[in-house]
């Protein structure tokens, strides 16, 4: 997927964070070693599922798929699907990584809010112990929380609603919520090499 960088300019922490970023990096998302390679019920892995949801995709409808969709629609009591359209199933982008982590710099604001109350104590602790890992972990936890909040709030109200067919099939109108397995694969990791 892509790389998102956040520039933090926060008083006394500025120099501390610049030093930390030279030796630590934080990743958040559907990560290798954290379930990304596991297979979903549909036969794709969670990294692929995450990419489909993050960026959207168009899937060409085959004859076999058209028959399945027609039978499923009938079983669900939906009107017969018409042979109109462009011959594709369109899955809209429902960004659970880029949008939450870049919109109004939510991660930075969340980290700042967590640090506000104890800024001097945190700086003293990290300076005394040279423990940049603590700050990197705090950033990772905050980023993961923001991403998970996107799942809870339908992308902060920005995700496209499910189609009537999808609602009938899933039994729910909430996007990305049928099994919860994708959001359960969201993880963060801190790497000490700065990459």
Model-found features: residue ranges?
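Short, Lys/Arg-rich flexible segments
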Residues: 1-195
């Amino acid at each position: 997927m892509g790389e998102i960088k956040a520039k933090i300019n926060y008083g006394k922490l500025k120099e501390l964070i610049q030093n930390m970023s030279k030796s630590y990096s934080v990743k958040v998302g559907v990560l290798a070693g954290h379930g990304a390679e596991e297979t979903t019920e549909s036969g794709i892995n969670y990294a692929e599922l995450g990419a489909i949801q993050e960026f959207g995709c168009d899937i060409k409808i085959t004859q076999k798929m058209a028959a399945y969709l027609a039978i499923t629609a009938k079983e669900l009591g939906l009107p017969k699907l018409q042979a109109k359209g462009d011959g594709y199933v369109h899955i809209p982008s429902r960004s659970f990584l880029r949008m939450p982590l870049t919109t109004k710099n939510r991660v930075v604001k969340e980290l700042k809010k967590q640090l506000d109350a104890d800024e001097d104590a945190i700086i003293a602790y990290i300076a005394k112990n040279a423990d940049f890992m603590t700050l990197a972990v705090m950033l990772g936890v905050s980023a993961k929380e923001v991403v998970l909040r996107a799942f809870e709030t339908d992308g902060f109200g920005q995700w496209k609603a499910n189609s009537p067919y999808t609602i009938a099939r899933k039994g729910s109108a909430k996007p990305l919520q049928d099994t919860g397995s994708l959001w359960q694969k969201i993880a963060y990791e801190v790497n000490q090499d700065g990459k």
